[in-house]
């Protein structure tokens, strides 16, 4: 119970130059630690702790405290909720994050992003796209060295621990969560139209290449992007076991033509008590498939859209299929030509983990944890001859695997 208790013999005094001083009793607000709610238990990584025994800086964001707007990455659910957490999204505004800072810049040569943990599986920012935001039960943020020390140098920039939802006892239930939205450019640069460009050139006596059209290239490359999120979950269980399975889909269309993202996610959690509660077994799987299509040259596309000759047409040559270009300005190209470039990235991610908890004594447990993670990324680019002098094509892929295991007595 919260109580306001006056401190004996304590006065808070205010004295202003040339004015009469004033004093009043000083009050402090206290709370009995033993009266903290039972849900104040934090998952700090390899172990669990409560407000009574955690000495470092730890913050927990539950589902009720998360942001509710359309989000593409789980960390957006806690943006603005955690002091000191800075999130920088990628230029295309899709699911990927460019950087995340929790404890500021801690290294000039190594990475400064915090360590990401999902249900005990260690990873980086790329792992976040495999977790659908509504599948998350809570975030626990570790900032202090006393709590991140358990992860060694990997936790030097802080730790963000994500716990996904689990099944509950009862009949099988189905839950659906969906949302829709649109995105568009808020405003454009105020540039000369084709008619204004001709008029100004005539007044100044300039010699210009006039194709006879009036094209707003900023508007020509834009589109109204549709956004949609869908997630369906099945969960249930009994006294000794429970399960939860969910499937998610996100579709994002950018405000520029040919920009977009499709993301498919899957998550499964199962738990089983064995030998009359002597052993607790937990199994989990989560994974995703993401397809991105982005601009090949973001800076040149937007710069050209603002600076390109507005008297040029907004369609290619009917005979050759090529776009009209300005040959005297190497950094200004027809922005619509860049819409023909195919720049794709496909990423697949899969992770499985298992945890066995042996309840040896009342206050002694042995926990055995293991995880396997696999990811693959494929990049592909194609620049047709109508855009690039001799055309260009590229394809590359990379993959990674990781095994993690630990044994702990607690």
Can you say where each PLM-predicted feature lies in the sequence?
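Surface-exposed loop/interface segments of Gram-negative outer-membrane beta-barrel transport/assembly proteins
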Residues: 32, 168-213, 255-256, 265, ...
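Proline-centered flexible-loop/turn and helix-kink motifs
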Residues: 78, 83, 307-311, 362
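Hydrophobic residues in alpha-helical membrane-spanning segments
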Residues: 26, 84, 311-314, 357
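Short, small/polar-rich motifs associated with maturation and membrane association
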Residues: 1-268, 273-274, 279-286, 349-351
């Amino acid at each position: 119970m919260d109580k306001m208790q006056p401190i004996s013999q304590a006065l808070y005094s205010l004295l202003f130059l040339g004015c009469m001083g004033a004093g009043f009793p000083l009050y402090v607000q206290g709370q009995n630690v033993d009266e903290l709610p039972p849900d104040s238990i934090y998952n700090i990584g390899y172990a669990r702790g409560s407000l009574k025994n955690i000495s470092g800086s730890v913050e927990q964001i539950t589902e009720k405290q998360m942001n509710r707007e359309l989000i593409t990455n789980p960390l957006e659910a806690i943006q603005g909720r955690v002091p000191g957490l800075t999130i920088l999204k990628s230029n295309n505004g899709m699911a990927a994050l460019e950087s995340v800072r929790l404890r500021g810049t801690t290294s000039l040569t190594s990475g400064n992003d915090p360590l990401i943990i999902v249900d005990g599986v260690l990873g980086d920012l790329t792992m976040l796209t495999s977790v659908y935001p509504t599948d998350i039960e809570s975030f626990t943020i570790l900032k202090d060295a006393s709590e991140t020390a358990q992860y060694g140098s990997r936790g030097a920039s802080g730790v963000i621990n994500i716990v996904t939802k689990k099944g509950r006892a009862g009949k099988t239930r189905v839950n659906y969560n969906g949302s829709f939205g649109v995105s568009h450019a808020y405003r454009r640069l105020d540039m000369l139209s084709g008619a204004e460009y001709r008029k100004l050139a005539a007044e100044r006596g300039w010699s210009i290449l006039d194709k006879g059209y009036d094209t707003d290239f900023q508007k020509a490359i834009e589109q109204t992007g549709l956004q949609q999120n869908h997630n369906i979950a099945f969960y249930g269980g009994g006294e000794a076991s429970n399960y939860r399975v969910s499937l998610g889909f996100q579709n994002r269309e950018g405000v520029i033509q040919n920009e977009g993202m499709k993301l498919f996610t899957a998550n499964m959690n199962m738990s089983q008590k064995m030998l009359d509660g002597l052993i607790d077994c937990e199994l989990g799987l989560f994974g995703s498939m993401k397809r991105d299509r982005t601009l090949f040259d973001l800076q040149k596309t937007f710069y050209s859209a603002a600076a390109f000759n507005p008297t040029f047409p907004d369609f290619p040559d009917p005979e050759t299929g090529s776009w009209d270009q300005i040959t005297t300005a190497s950094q200004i190209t027809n922005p619509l030509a860049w819409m023909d470039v195919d720049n794709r990235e496909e990423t697949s991610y899969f992770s499985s983990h298992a945890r066995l908890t042996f309840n040896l004594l009342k206050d002694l447990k042995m926990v055995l944890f293991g995880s396997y993670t696999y990811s693959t990324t494929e990049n592909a680019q194609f620049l047709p001859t109508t855009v690039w002098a001799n055309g260009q094509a590229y394809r590359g892929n990379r993959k990674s695997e990781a095994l993690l295991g630990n044994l702990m007595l607690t």
